């Protein structure tokens, strides 16, 4: 999709950071619990591209599957992914000279407590099914605030559940930025 000159983006291979792709691949292919007593890759994409679309939009949809983003920077296509990592820089009041931190956050109404994730099921020949994910503590505190999510290219109930769980945890815990 990225390098093909006929139907792809015609991005030269020299513009791709193979280490970014390898790192993302390792994280995506790591086996995790599927919720049914087995294991499956953390992220799997089953997608057929059969219509013309803006290449950038297709790439962003595909990278969103693994909580990533692709952008062109420093002469190459760079992949970044939301995943556990070590801190790269500790920012605190001792790092700021003659200034104050300004914080902004999200309103509680914007934070969801349940997610309904639409995915396609292999067992029912690709029919759309829904995985309901609930943050019990948040529901007890704020009530039911639903978020509908369409999991593009997702055929796994376990992956759909992880998508919903990550969305809810992110909205409840990552509410303030500086």
What do these predicted ranges mean?
Residues 1-178:
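C-terminal extracytoplasmic interaction modules
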């Amino acid at each position: 999709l990225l390098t093909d000159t006929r139907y792809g983006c015609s991005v030269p291979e020299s513009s791709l950071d193979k280490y970014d792709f390898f790192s993302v691949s390792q994280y995506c292919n790591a086996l995790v619990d599927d919720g049914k007593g087995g294991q499956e890759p953390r992220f799997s994409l089953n997608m057929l591209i059969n219509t013309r679309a803006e290449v950038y939009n297709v790439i962003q949809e595909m990278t969103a599957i693994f909580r990533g983003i692709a952008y062109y920077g420093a002469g190459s296509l760079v992949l970044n992914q939301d995943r556990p990592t070590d801190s790269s820089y500790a920012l605190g009041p001792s790092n700021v000279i003659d200034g104050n931190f300004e914080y902004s956050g999200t309103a509680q109404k914007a934070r969801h407590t349940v997610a309904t994730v639409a995915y396609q099921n292999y067992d029912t020949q690709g029919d759309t099914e829904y995985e309901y994910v609930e943050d019990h503590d948040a529901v007890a505190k704020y009530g039911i605030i639903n978020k509908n999510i369409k999991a593009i290219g997702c055929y796994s109930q376990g992956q759909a559940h992880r998508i919903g769980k990550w969305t809810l945890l992110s909205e409840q815990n990552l509410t303030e930025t500086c």
